[in-house]
Regions:
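Surface-exposed loop/turn elements that mediate protein-protein interactions on large endomembrane-trafficking
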Residues: 1-3, 25-54, 82-115, 136-156, ...
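Beta-strand-rich domains and repeat architectures in extracellular enzymes and scaffolds
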Residues: 2-24
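Repeated scaffold domains used in trafficking and secretory/extracellular systems
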Residues: 2-10, 46-65, 109-125, 157-168, ...
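Short, hydrophobic/proline-enriched secondary-structure or compact coil segments at domain edges
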Residues: 16-20, 70-74, 270-276
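Hydrophobic beta-strand positions that form the internal "hydrophobic ladder"
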Residues: 18, 70-72, 132-133, 172-173, ...
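Residue-level signature of beta-propeller blades and closely related beta-rich strand-turn architectures
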Residues: 24, 76-78, 139, 178, ...
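N-terminal non-globular leader segments, chiefly Sec-dependent signal peptides
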Residues: 59-80, 86-93
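Loop/turn-rich, solvent-exposed surfaces of beta-rich toroidal or solenoidal domains
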Residues: 164-167, 171-175, 180-181, 207-232, ...
Length: 365
């Protein structure tokens, strides 16, 4: 269909099931049977009102297994259902065998959607046994016990740029000193095991996290003598090398650019984009970006979203599933029903707004 390019999908390891969200609805496609299931949507069949088109919410897929079972969450304003009118994070599981979804947890917050969505993008992860949900919110890292509705604030007052999370890989990393430009220990926690791994540097160096590629942590190392913090808001942390590591402490890849430095980066699926600068007599100047592709990215070429341009349909989005679908073939469409977990109600907790401990500015336009 015709959509924006800001789309993501997830699949199981066997590439049998593909889940994707578009226009406020979550869909699951099963190859082979060619069944397309609407897993979740606020939209009503046959009629629309303001609640259908209000888009201050977002669907995020956490994981999907080889049977098509899925964990996903909805963050932001709740257009309908029992939480209608509230703002928060609802965590659901989908059972492919019964074509049904179950709400496991609802977290009520006071944070605006634009900020909440960024927090959940950083980390919103449910443990494999469905007993714990981990969330970053307003500079704090929370462990929510779904079995007894308890909330534990593991870390608080985390500064911007001092922590990163992986919702798909179940990992969380934070600078021990909590100083973006002056930290020498970076801790990595496996949320399934609770084990921590510490990464350190030499005394004349400092560390900074960049992000995650799946469950692998990406961070950079800079020399203290190169770091420029004189102009507030224009600080430069020039990393002379970038490392990709796993939770066992093993270095999977080391990137050391020649004649330039890395000052930041972003991860889009399996592609790591690095922003770079060169050092001149007048300071640091921008230079070309560089990219690191995950080793499995080549295997992904037959899957994912592709874009076709035409005068009639403009930019059309196509989901590649690795199978050939004859033109004119229409998938069987199913609609999931919502059920309660047997003998239990969904856990509900509320996290109050926190007083900001650092000045933050958000650019809206």
């Amino acid at each position: 269909g015709i959509n924006s390019r800001d789309l993501t999908y997830k699949s199981d390891t066997d590439k049998k099931y593909f889940a994707f969200a578009q226009q406020g609805s979550l869909w699951l496609y099963e190859t082979g049977t060619k069944k397309l299931t609407q897993v979740f949507s606020f939209l009503q069949n046959g009629k629309l009102d303001a609640r259908d088109i209000y888009d201050e919410n977002n669907i995020r897929i956490i994981n999907i297994d080889s049977s098509g079972n899925m964990t996903f969450l909805l963050c932001g304003y709740m257009n309908r259902c029992k939480h209608e009118g509230e703002c928060g994070v609802a965590v659901y599981t989908y059972d492919a065998a019964t074509t049904s979804i179950t709400e496991r947890l609802y977290v009520e917050t006071q944070e605006a959607f634009s900020l909440l969505d960024k927090d959940v993008e950083n980390l919103g992860y449910m443990s494999a046994d469905r007993t714990h949900f981990y969330l970053t919110l307003e500079g704090s890292f929370y462990d929510i016990n779904i079995t007894d509705n308890s909330v534990t604030e593991q870390f608080s007052n985390l500064s911007s740029g001092c922590y990163v999370g992986s919702s798909t890989g179940g990992k969380f990393a934070w600078l021990q000193e909590n100083k973006k430009y002056d930290s020498s220990t970076l801790n990595l926690r496996d949320l399934e095991t609770g084990n921590d791994t510490a990464f350190t540097c030499d005394s004349d160096e400092r560390l900074q996290p960049i992000g995650f590629i799946d469950s692998d942590l990406v961070y950079g190392v800079a020399k203290v003598s190169d770091i420029d913090t004189e102009d507030k808001g224009s600080e430069v942390f020039p990393m002379y090398k970038v490392l990709i590591v796993n939770s066992a402490g093993e270095t999977l890849k080391t990137y050391e650019p020649d004649g330039c430095y890395v000052i930041g980066g972003s991860v889009n699926d399996k592609l790591l984009t690095l922003d770079r600068v060169k050092k001149t007599k007048r300071g640091y100047t921008e230079t070309s970006q560089d990219h690191i592709v995950n080793s499995s990215a080549d295997d992904e070429a037959a899957y994912g979203f592709a874009y076709v341009e035409s005068d009639k349909k403009q930019t059309e989005t196509i989901l590649k599933t690795g199978e050939t679908i004859e033109e004119g073939t229409t998938p069987q469409i199913l609609y999931a029903k919502q059920v309660k977990a047997e003998g239990e109600e969904a856990a509900e907790v509320s996290i109050p707004a926190k007083k900001q401990t650092e000045e933050l500015y958000y650019v809206y336009a």
